[in-house]
Every structure is written in structure tokens, then in C-alpha cells.
Amino acid sequence: MTAEALSSGELKAIRPYPARTGPKGNLVYKLITTTDHKMIGIMYCVACFIFFFVGGLLALLMRTELAAPGLQFLSNEQFNQLFTMHGTIMLLFYATPIVFGFANLVLPLQIGAPDVAFPRLNAFSFWLFLFGAAIGMAGFITPGGAADFGWTAYTPLTDAIHSPGVGGDLWIMGLIVAGLGTILGAVNMITTVVCLRAPGMTMFRMPIFTWNILVTSILVLIAFPLLTAALFGLAADRHLGAHIYDAANGGVLLWQHLFWFFGHPEVYIIALPFFGIVSEIFPVFSRKPIFGYTTLVYATLSIAALSVAVWAHHMFATGAVLLPFFSFMTYLIAVPTGIKFFNWVGTMWKGQLTFETPMLFSVGFAVTFLLGGLTGVLLASPPLDFHVTDSYFVVAHFHYVLFGTIVFSTFAGIYFWFPKMTGRLLDEQLGKLHFWLTFIGFHTTFLVQHWLGDMGMPRRYADYLPTDGFQGLNVVSTIGSFILGASMFPFVWNVFKSWRYGEVVTVDDPWGYGNSLEWATSCPPPRHNFTELPRIRSERPAFELHYPHMVERLRDEAYVGRRHAEELVEVSLH
């Protein structure tokens, strides 16, 4: 472009980052050697979405098989491998690591840190997860196929007699390696939050997302080492004849206790960070501060504490656990979750709501998770649980809870923070199409499964009889699953197109009302995140930076309750 053209005011193509330099293969070298938390966060997200698509493909194969009675194109053995690997991929190779994807992308920015506490350990955690997941999935290319004993790996199904193939061993080792990556990631996040907060960033000025990652990381340190130990025991059983999980010694129940003491905190490990994501999004699109900040923090801590006291509700049907205690504790965990809902609704109440794509996905999360939570309260009652245990009612319940939380909030977070990651905005029209396809597809797939479960359709069966009367609802469910699968196409195209050609973000805060510190630096941020930090005087430093004329009023309104309490104390003293 000539100097004349520039002086005449002609538009010049700009990029949100410097032009690419370096020889061919430079990007690959950079990815392999990087210790930049933002780059690692993007790598986590991309890797997790690849696993998400693979897990979704396995689910589509299962739903196609179940659309009609009789075995269509899968054998019983193949079906067993599919549901085992589908559960494992979705929970341990997608949901858990994408927590650390978001934590890497956002947490150091939110606390004003230049990077995480241990950047090399951070990179090591990612590569452990990636190679662990690859090892776990490698069973598909072995002669005996992948693991086929269910993602819960109940003994004696997992012993050397019932699962002799190498697929089971690869599954065990893959989970051990990927789990180590998760443990190290949690150590890193705890240290980062405790040691690297910017001046003025007290614990109760941290964003809710940062709080939730901190609590989640503590839960990881409680739960994942136990899983690792249990898996090593299982490997010893299979190869050394250790007899740890022998049925004769009560080993079957031992495995269930060990697994679910990991498994239930794991459910909250993959829920709390996503509660944090929507807690960041609701205030921005409601044009209001988060309602009940401190109660949200205490609710998060309560959920974490209770989550390690309810594991045996997965074992009601064994008849070997104290039903009243675990039933009551499970009911109890609904209380802090209800407080969170109250706060989210309170944040939106009388706000100036706008429904951009992140807000749509957040509302979709709230609706779906609420329904899943209500069926969870039903399942907490042992008499009801005995009726529907191991049926499609349970499948519908945990998909409502997990898909509602993880997938809807993941998409909300990606649409929300994509401009911060890349310096470009995602396409709103494609985003709305993506949301409605996801929402309609999901509810069509899983709502009818509650009724299938109540009618008595067991989970994990590859086939059913024409006389069972399950076909009609199964066809509806399968149609919904293909709508859900189709929803990924606008998303992938949107990310690809926007990353390369999307609208360039030229401001720190493209949404206009961001609260936390990540909206006080450029899009994308410089290598060490900030060229200068604003003063941190509340939990909304970026908002106060962009709206300085509002600070006095915000202070005045924020402390009305506290001031009123002080006045009451003074009156009572006089």
C-alpha cells in the first residue's frame, strides 16, 4: 500500500497481533516449548474439544444402534467399548481438563498476575493430560479393542479373567498419567491464587471464577490421588495377582467406595468452575454487580465440603451403606446450590438484560441444570432410587446435570472470552444458531430418557425387544442426538472463520461492562498480561477503571446494609 493511499484515508488491513515471522514449523515449535499460560490455555481448549467431538461421535453410534430393536451394526462387545470410552472421554479427557483450560486463560489475568506460579509445571501438566488421554484411547487400535467394563470400572468386571485384553491396561495407565497432570495443574492454581495476587487483590476481592478454581483445585488434591492409588491397585490385581479387589474379601465394595469417593467430588470438580463462568457472565449482561458475592463464596465452600460426604448415594442398591445418612447429606447439598440459583436470579432481577450469545448459553445452563438438580433430589430418596437405579432415568439425570453445567457453560465462556484470547469477536448470528440447535437437540435427546427409565429400560444395553415398547421414545432421543451433533458445525465454522477474519477488537472490554481485571488489559494481552494495573479497591476493578464517575455511587450503594447494621448497633448502645 502506497503512502498516497494511506494519506488519502484508505482503509488498511490490520491484525490484532504482529505479522507472523520465523521459518516453517515455527508455530509447532512454539506450541511444544511454550510456557505462556494463555497459549497453554488455548491448547487445553483445542485438545479438549477434539476429545469432545470424539466422545460425541461414540454417543451418536450408540444412539443410532438404539433407534430400533435388534442389533443393527454394533455387536454387544463394541457397544460396551463405546459407552465405556464415551464416559471416560467426556468426563476425564474433556470436562476435567477444560477446567484447567479456562483457569489458564483467565485466572492469572483476573488476579493481576504475569503468569501462573510454575509455568514449566503448567506445560508439563498439559502434556501429561494429552499423552494420558492418548494412551487411554489407544485401546481402539489393539486387537482386543478398548476397555469395555464401563467408565466406573466395577470389579470383578475389570479383573484379568473378565477383561483380559490390553485395552483395559491402557485405560488404567492412561487415567493414571492424565490424573497426574490434573493433580499438578491443581497445585499450580492453588499456588498462583495464594502467592501471585496483585496489590490490593484481597481474597474477598477475587472474582467468583477465581474462587471457584481455588476450591476446585483443593477438591482435586483430595480426590485424584485416591483414584490414582485405586488404579495402581487394579493394575496390581490384573498383573501381579494382588487380590486387592477379590469378591471373596469384599473387594467389590472396596472398589466402589474408593471409586465413588473420587467420583462424587469429581462431579463438583467439573461443576464449580462452570458455576464460576456463569457468575462472571450474568453481571456483565445484566449491567449489575453480582448479587450476594460473599454468599456465593460461602456456597461454593459448602458444596465442596459436602461433596466429600455423599459418595455412597451411588451405592444405595448395594444394601451395604447407611441410607438415612447419605440420603440426608445428598438433600443437604441442594441448599448451597439453591443459594447460587437465588443469587444468579437476583443478579438478573430488574437488570438491563441483553441476550448476546454468552448470556444465552448461561441462561440455557440455568434452565438445564435446574431440571437436572430436581431429578437429583428425586434420586437422593432411596425408595425412588431403588425403582430407577441403573435405568435411563439415571442417564437422563446426569446428562442434564453434566451437559447442562459443563457444555452450556463451556460455550458461554468461549463466546465470552474469545475476544480476550484472540483479539477478534465471534459471529453473533452463528452463535445464536449454535445455541438453539444445542438447546433443542439436548432436550429432545434426554428429556424422553426420564420416561424410558421409568418404563424400565436399563442403561448400557445394546438391544431391547419390540414388545418392550421402548422404540418410540428411543427414536425421538436419537433424532435429538443428531440435532445436537449438527449444532457443532456452526460452532466449528464460527471459531475457524472468526479466528482468521472476525471483527477486530480494539478496546480492552468489548462487552462494555466487564468487572474483573482481565477486562483492564488489551485483547489479546501482552506476554506478561499487563503494562499497568488499575487500583484494586473492590471486586470490580475493571468496571471502576472504565466508569470512574460511578465509583462513589457504587461504594455508597454497596455498603448500605453494612452501614444500616452499624447504625442499629449504635442505637442499641445508646
UniProtKB/Swiss-Prot annotation:
Residues given in the record as Cu cation binding sites: 264, 268, 313-314
KW Transferase (keyword) present: no
EC number: 7.1.1.9
Main subcellular location: membrane
CDD domains linked: Ubiquinol_Oxidase_I (cd01662)
PANTHER family reported in the protein's UniProt record: CYTOCHROME C OXIDASE SUBUNIT 1
UniProt-recorded name of the protein: Probable cytochrome c oxidase subunit 1
Taxonomic source organism: Mycobacterium leprae (strain TN)
